Structures are given as structure tokens and as C-alpha cells.
A protein has these predicted regions:
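Structured, contiguous alpha/beta core segments that scaffold functional sites
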Residues: 1-79, 83, 105-106, 113-114, ...
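Low-complexity, highly charged intrinsically disordered N-terminal segments
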Residues: 85-97
């Protein structure tokens, strides 16, 4: 694997790549690129997919600013995040998990630690709203490079318009059938401070250093992540059109 920014969780053994002419199916909108021989990988950062993905997030945020849509999002958020000063708005349930009580206690302890890193009790409303509007919620996992066993030191939010998950595959042509067989693949996150629309190579980040929670909804082509606000685009546009038309109508009929 190439050198990426961020830490890597060492695993006992990597799962071998089984010969196939199609990459694995991902449910997180991962973009697939093919390595270009000795010249490395080529990624069209000005392509339609990257541009549309960023524009789509900006469109969701624009729709969320509509007063009627904003009120609906607030109602959904308030119904989803329920809590008081004495209890946390979220908890992990391990009743049906067939593991020892000691491991369950460890999981609960680490879960509470993550909530403290996110300051979830204070910012649960904002965290849920970001995820609901954008359709994705990325965080950079920051650890102490000199003492990785100390665990996570900080979870830092990343603007999803600047981050994209990429799968880089290397193909080899089968001499018998002529099919292009995937023999190697690398996954990483590509970060660009100026967004995907900017030209140039971005920063490659190891996937273990990024937490990426998505809505789980994909477009019909299963290439882009959709927000729960996607179905609200048309109604909001129609509402704005009616409001603009009403203003023009009143101005036109004012002399009467």
C-alpha cells in the first residue's frame, strides 16, 4: 500500500484479492479509479461526479435554509435527539450480543469516551443536523503518534465538500479471455482544502484515520451518497417559484 497521511491499524492478515473483473460493491459512494501504469493514478477532479457531489451538498444546505424546510428539520432533530440534564440522549445496548460481561463493560466504557470526545451531550443537536442535511458526517481521528496505545485524543470534524473516498484498482489483462482482472486495490480518502472542484493532487489519508458515517442512501447509479433532503429539492424549488411568481403578479397588477 502507498504511503498515506494518518495512522494505520495493523491487522493480522489482509484478505487476499479474489480474481474478478468488477470491484467490490461499496455502500458509501466510493469513487473507483484505475492506475495508469508507471505514471501512477489519474483522478479527474474536475469531472462531473466530483462536481455534482459537492454541488449536491451545497444544494442540500441551501434547501435547509428555506424557513419551511428548516422548521421541518428542527422537528425531526428534536424528535430524534431526546434527553435531559441527567441522562445522555444516546446509549449503546449490548443485551443480544453473545460476549462476556467484561467485554461489554469495556465497549460501554469506550462508547462513553467517544461521546465525551464529541461533547455529544452539548452538541448532539448540531451533530445530528449536519448528518441529516449533508447525508454524511466525516471526522478525523487524531492520536498521539508517539504513544498510539493511549487511544484517541481528538475527533475533528471535516467539511464533507473537501473529502472524498477513493478506491484505486490495478488491472491485469487475462491472456486467455482478454478480460481485465483486478489484481490490487487500495482505499483512501482524498482531502482538498479548496474542495473537489479545485485542480491538483489532494492529500491521501489512510481510511483508518477517518470516521465516515453516511445516510446509507445512494442514487440509482449507486455512485453518489444522497441526503434525506434529496426528495425535498423539488418541493422547495416549486415553493420558491410560486413565491417569486406571486411577487411579480402583485407588482404587475398594482396599477389596477
Amino acid at each position: 500500500m502507498a504511503e498515506f497521511f494518518g495512522f494505520e491499524i495493523k491487522r493480522k492478515a489482509n484478505e487476499p484479492i479474489r480474481p474478478s473483473f468488477v470491484p467490490n460493491t461499496d455502500e458509501d459512494g466510493t469513487g473507483v479509479i484505475t492506475t495508469g501504469g508507471h505514471f501512477g493514478a489519474y483522478l479527474d477532479l474536475d469531472g462531473d461526479k466530483a462536481k455534482n457531489e459537492v454541488d449536491l451538498i451545497l444544494k442540500y444546505r441551501d434547501i435547509a435554509a428555506q424557513p419551511e424546510c428548516d422548521a421541518a428539520i428542527e422537528d425531526i432533530t428534536n424528535e430524534s435527539i431526546v434527553g435531559n440534564h441527567d441522562e445522555s440522549p444516546i446509549q449503546i445496548i449490548l443485551d443480544k450480543l453473545e460476549i462476556s460481561d467484561k467485554i461489554k463493560d469495556t465497549i460501554r466504557f469506550e462508547f462513553e469516551e467517544v461521546l465525551q470526545l464529541l461533547n455529544f451531550n452539548s452538541y448532539a443537536h448540531d451533530i445530528f443536523r449536519k448528518w441529516y442535511v449533508d447525508g454524511r458526517l466525516p471526522y478525523h481521528v487524531i492520536i498521539d503518534g508517539k504513544n498510539q496505545k493511549a487511544g484517541i485524543k481528538e475527533l475533528r470534524y471535516i467539511d464533507p465538500t473537501k473529502l472524498r473516498k477513493v478506491k484505486e484498482i490495478e488491472e491485469k489483462q487475462d491472456p486467455t479471455t482478454g478480460a481485465k482482472i483486478i489484481v490490487k486495490q487500495d482505499e483512501y480518502f482524498l482531502f482538498q482544502d479548496k474542495g473537489h472542484a479545485a485542480a491538483g493532487q489532494g492529500l491521501k489519508i489512510h481510511p483508518d484515520a477517518i470516521i465516515y458515517a453516511t445516510s446509507g442512501m445512494l442514487d440509482p447509479a449507486r455512485k453518489r451518497i444522497l441526503s434525506y433532503l434529496h426528495k425535498a429539492i423539488k418541493p422547495v424549488n416549486q415553493l420558491r417559484m410560486m413565491e417569486d411568481s406571486l411577487v411579480i403578479y402583485r407588482l404587475a397588477r398594482a396599477p389596477e
